[in-house]
């Protein structure tokens, strides 16, 4: 079972979503382009419009989603494409009666922002005991905590580490930079045993890089072949294949640059002798005779740190020399009393 918090670099999800616009041939093309990148997971949306939008109250919205539907056979074909290429397949499932035939392809379940408080849908996924990833657009912190508590009350397995993962998201296409609110991930980290991540709707990839630096375990972004001359809005916030590979390369570089939160001398510093050569020791700045009482102006702190560290500079003031010592000679505490 995948644990997103144990990965060395963030888990990346290329969200094709509805960018195929109901055209299966185009869906296959986008899927293959995503497979050819270094992304970890390729994601779609599974639904029947009548299970998602009320056709009486919102007929235009219902018709929009109907145009973007694919068939069961087509969804399975796309899932098999990913599986055969050793890429993870995933989908936001908006019609719970579609879960049974796609579950075997899913290593986790993704809840979109609009469904983060749709408890009947969420409950239908919990019987599979797979990690849950939840986008949190539109939500208050109280609503997020309530959803986490609902899941854990329904199935205690989800109290375990990284079984629930919260993605900061702003539900608009595109959003301004000041609407990304990536810092919210720090609040999510305070919820016991959850993983955190970011689902991006900005233009470009800067927000994703920042989220990686902030400790995102999961990064989700929309994916397309080309943003030019596209009417459907999601294309405008989507990354293209070369941009995906550049992003993943940059994430790995930035994670290396971030390093460890534990401060200690690194092997390269030790091996090259820099602890000695860069730090200072205490030396006499003049020749002095046995019996001389050391004054501050007799001492100087110089590189390299051979002998007595400059940390002990003050300790030598007022000491008496037990032997004659030459200027710049390496010192030892045994020379003083």
Where are the predicted features?
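Catalytic cores and adjacent flexible loops of soluble metabolic enzymes
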Residues: 1-337
